[in-house]
Amino acid sequence: MYLKAGDTLLLEELLYGLMLVSGNDAALAVAHCVSGDTASFVELMNETAARLGMRHSHFSNPNGLDAGDHYSSAGDMAKLTAYALEKEAFRRIVSTTSITIGERYLANHNKLLKLYDGCLGVKTGYTKAAGRTLVSAAEREGLTLVCVTLCDGDDWNDHMALLDYGFSLCRMETAAPAGRVLASVQVRGGSSARVPLMADEDLRYPLMGEEKLTVVAETPVSVPAPVVPGQVIGKARAYLAGEEVASVDLVAAAPSARVEFQEESSIFERFFG
């Protein structure tokens, strides 16, 4: 990124320099901005890797240059990318084809942004030890796939072929769309004895071949009044081969007002008084 002493940039601007043009100076600046020094940031990197289950990775610097005890795997990079793509800011940055920051014009090194329909970008890389490395992601019909290659001299073509293959195998399955009523719950002391419960958002998960999802609604036996529409009352969980793979909140689809004691008394007197 060709930073100079005295330059002042926003953290997000440094991230553009890091992700679009592989600015090693930007990586060091981010490390100092976030953690105060490089060593503390590297410690944070390794803590995050452990939390994400990246068992074949260990980092010793923030910029990814060859160093002792600094390594990763394609699988671990895929895990990290899947986590990062959940962040809207990350998606926006890595999918940017070019940006001007002050007097700096940054053009994304990732050619797939222009070559492959639905490409979200992510990151190119090269070192003597690793060779050409590339992490890419693409989205079609709500399904996002991540592709990682290491030491690949024909990575652009390989990624397009691998992503095509992945999309031919996978589909995004909606087990329960937002708004679908999946259960009901008893309301104690309410104007309605029960209220329906619906999925707060789409319950979705990617599947391959003949795989099927099983949906289980988990609700309490009863809840106290009042109940208002949109109130979270339970969970809808999706299972694949007996393993939970996704969940969404179950919310009240209708209200149930609290019946006050005086109202209960008047009803009693109406029938028995």
Where are these regions (language model features)?
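Active-site-adjacent loops and short helices of periplasmic peptidoglycan-processing enzymes
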Residues: 1-75, 84-87
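Domain-terminus/edge residues, biased toward the C-terminal soluble/receptor-binding domains
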Residues: 54-58, 66-71, 75-273
